[in-house]
């Protein structure tokens, strides 16, 4: 995310009308599609009691704005996350179609900063959740920001309140999940003006700093899910299934904030690395319970971002919807590596802990390719053997 400018953009009445008309449209088959590793079946409308609560999801930016490493953008990542949150909400809960709105649902729609809050205000949203990732840092951390400032040494949250309460769920849920893979921690769940202007006991501007918090008429929060300028995170951001994990952490937080139970969904995920140098391995075939997953390769996806076949590696795999409490045999196979077989028992989600829905199984594989002796090494060895005879 770039720091949002303190201005009100020109509002497009057409954009607002289009968004309001689109709110009742069901999720498309393409949006809902998952590959063979997703759950074979899930209980429809498992969570009831959504009521008339209106949720507005704001995948930050538009198109391919805020490009990170290798050209993959923040706008693309957060759109995928928002669409997956929508998928989980419509799959697991009885949320009415007219009570969920996204400010954009494809990579072509352009929504200005000011339009986002105006659409939410015109629609009458009860909560505004803005999804972002960050840039330009050396440590891969999260942060959640709700509207607030300091008055005479006292922190004040904007009204209607609720952003802080939502962040108290989302921040640990998202951070603990991401720490399993590439994140190092969090910068906190913060009043936005206090975050950008720390150390002041009495802010002169007593209103939220971020536009989405300042201009929205409802409780709101903006999250930063790691840094798209850090390689370890960005190589995961490119992976389709990894983003489903971030989406589920947000989905789980939304349910907790709204006072609803969390579904007992499960995920098995991990990173497969070379045992000698810890570099993630591309093209590993992972098999469990008759399902297979092959880690990303240059041919499958990385060619979209680089001509260097050896530049990007994530070694990430994920299976969704395995049976909680059951022990599975997991096999890892890759050309040039010894096959690895592991036993894993799937944790049961829905117990309230931040990452109890994901069972993490990281694996190291050993390269079995024969050692290559250079011409120099060969000549040196012959000289040594010859001299040892005398």
Predicted regions and their residues:
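Bacterial N-terminal signal peptides that target proteins for export
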Residues: 3-15
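Extracellular beta-sheet/turn segments enriched in Thr/Pro/Gly and aliphatic residues
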Residues: 340-376
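Hydrophobic core positions of the immunoglobulin-like beta-sandwich fold
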Residues: 318-320
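Catalytic-core regions of hydrolytic enzymes
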Residues: 35-160, 164
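Short, acidic Ser/Thr/Gly-rich low-complexity loop/linker segments typical of extracellular
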Residues: 288-316
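Active-site-adjacent mobile loop/cap segments within catalytic or ligand-binding domains
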Residues: 56, 130-140, 146-149, 186-262
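A short, solvent-exposed beta-strand micro-motif common in secreted/extracellular proteins
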Residues: 325-336
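Structural motif
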Residues: 263, 271-282, 377, 385
